[in-house]
Amino acid sequence: MLPHFLKDSFMEKRLNWKSRIGFILAGAGAAIGLGAIWKFPFMAGSNGGAVFLFPYVVMSLTVGLALLLAEVTLGRMGRGSVVTTFRRIGGKGWAVWGYLGVLTGFCVLSFYSAIGGWTIAYLVDALFSPEFLSDKTQLAQHFGAFVSSPVACIVSQTSFIVLTAVAVAFGINKGIERMGKILMPLLLVMVLAIIIWSLTLPNSGGGLKYLFSWNPSAFNFQSLLMAMGFTFFSLCVGCGCMMTYGSYLGKTEDLSVSCASIVFLTTLSSILGGLLVMPAVFAFGLDPASGPNLTFITMPYVFAQFSFGQVLAVAFFLCLLFAAITSAVSMLELVVAFLVDELKFGRRNACLVSTV
């Protein structure tokens, strides 16, 4: 006999994704974040290139897929927020793990939205003030002044979190699913366009060598741990975001196909993230170090060397924004689902409380 939370009467009480592709794109959007662009390329190149990529891909397709499948399966079984799911399946004592997941998602979103705000600010700069992009020293000074300005940071972060909240407030189908169907294909097209451009640059082969050469001397046990850690980080498993998304799946959905598709897209995006930045960075002999310097100083400087650099800069920061907001939406939905299911908030009120 099925437990009560798997019976048809219970399954019908919660909204479902309208299509498999909608869930896959939303799930991939949750997993594909800024780390694929500003963290993974440097991590892979500095830890042996292909020697690092091989265990990362293997772990993503094995351990990562198994964990994602388990989390999504639990979500579909529980048919509620992460707290609700743990309580229904494991009993009252297990609800504490759900609370920890909600707290983790909220804390991560609090600083992730700040970085997302930076992408909005730089997108606006690329659109309306492209002149500052041409000088690397000026770029560094501009970035330092920006992150040191409380007003600029608050305005940009607020803009980002408002966009995120609007998407979540519209609900699973009209908000999150629709956004994934629009933004993820656009993200892929723009990333591929920039990659094609970067591979045509002189000396771009240095970036390919940095990413894909077989360099065992740079790989050690710490590198293996980093590959494993990035596998979990890139697939967004462990905090409950995927469990929450899984709670909106119908009982007939083929989870193995959907989860395998998400893992494939996420792993591919990390590799594409390396191809997005490293060939261009090496073409100009610049420092490939990861983090904010790579995305907000080095890459804008590279784009500025071309007559159509403004177009490239706008496309690049749109890519960053799309990657950031699809991840942020999953974190906010984690919190909103908790407020709706456990505290009986309306969805829009839950979004308002979560963002404030």
State each model region's role.
Residues L15, A44-A70, A152-C153, S269-L272:
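Extracellular loop-to-transmembrane helix junctions
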Residues G22, G49-Y56, W94-S110, E177-L187, ...:
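Alpha-helical transmembrane segments and their helix-start/interface "positive-inside/aromatic belt" motifs
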Residues E12-W17, E177, K181-I325, V329, ...:
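Membrane-embedded translocation segments of transport machinery
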Residues G22-A28, G98-V102, P130-F170, C236-M243, ...:
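Transmembrane alpha-helical segments of multi-pass small-molecule transport proteins
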Residues L2-W38, L65-V72, R76-I89, A95-Y99, ...:
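Membrane-interface "cap" regions at the ends of multi-pass membrane proteins
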Residues D8-N16, F42-N47, M77-L100, S113-N173, ...:
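Inter-helical loop and helix-membrane interface segments of multi-pass membrane transporters/permeases
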Residues S46-V51, M77-S81, G91-W94, S247-V257, ...:
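Juxtamembrane helix-boundary/capping and inter-helix hinge elements in multi-pass membrane proteins
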Residues Y56-L65, V102-L127, S156-F170, P185-S198, ...:
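Hydrophobic core segments of alpha-helical transmembrane domains in multi-pass membrane transport
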